[in-house]
Amino acid sequence: MQDVPPSCPIVVGIDVGGTKTHLRAVAEDGTVTDHVRTSSGWRPHDPEAAAAWLAALVHEALPAGTRPSAVAVGGHACETPRQCAGIRLALRELLDVPALVVGDAELLVPAAGLDKGVGLVAGTGSVAVGRLSDGSPVQVGGWGAVLGDEGGSAGLVREAARAAWAAHDRGEDPDELALGLIAAFGVSEVPALGAALESATDVSAEWGRHAPVVFAAAAAGSALARQVIAEGGRSLAALVVRLAQRGVAVDDVVVAGTAVLAQPALYDAFAAWLAEAVPGARPRPLRVPPVEGAVSLARSLL
């Protein structure tokens, strides 16, 4: 990491994920500053609070007295144009610079160096975004760990628990998946998993951190875990199908998120289902940090 000289004009891109936030400041001379912190305190459904959180992050990351030339943000759980616009207006008022706020999945296409395509995130949660020919944004999926986020870490754990409960109801002995979940949640038996999941105060984060249990169980031979992963991959592919049905160009599907990129079993399931459902779609794993897309969007404001 290099420090940006206080006098050098800079653009700031921010990727606010479900768990981690990455700010990147790029100076006119090419100097780059990276600042990473947790996303604790991010409240995207309160525009004033979200803007204040972002402004504090900018001041925390940049040298004292430095004002960026432009700021672009991709925010987790920024789900509608109206919501994003509210945060943008409040942030622009606080920083007095050009600002743009979009959902975090919208960072993927520009991060990949593309002008159009689909951005699909499967990290703690899952969501896919694209744009119609007139530039209007379209988002599908998401909805949080309780109702949706299929194929994301939290959704996989939820579905794994459901699979373990169903096996228990069929009278089956606990397999590697059930035993792994019991150990991870610190309970004594499968029926106690329900209370353990319901006691979470931060559902997405607390469920999602146990996703490695699902993949470990699959590697150990659990048919239940393998089915959960396969269904997760199909759910991710279904997000792309929904975008295509709504008129979004889905030739290029830029994929990011630790759940899908760090776990070949999930990525392979997604790619196989996508090839079957939308033969012309090309999955493209993102090989650079999504914050690069925010930097690109910030530059476009100048």
Where are these regions (language model features)?
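ATP-binding/phosphotransfer module of carbohydrate and carboxylate kinases, centering on a glycine-rich
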Residues: 1-68, 90, 95, 111-118, ...
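Short active-site-proximal "capping" loops at secondary-structure junctions
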Residues: 40-44, 76-78, 107
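Alpha-helical substrate-recognition element adjacent to the catalytic core
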Residues: 52, 74-79
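Glycine- and acidic-rich phosphate- and metal-coordinating loops
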Residues: 68-74
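Solvent-exposed beta-strand sheet faces enriched in polar/charged residues
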Residues: 74, 102, 254-256
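Phosphate-binding/catalytic loop of phosphoryl-transfer enzymes
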Residues: 78-174
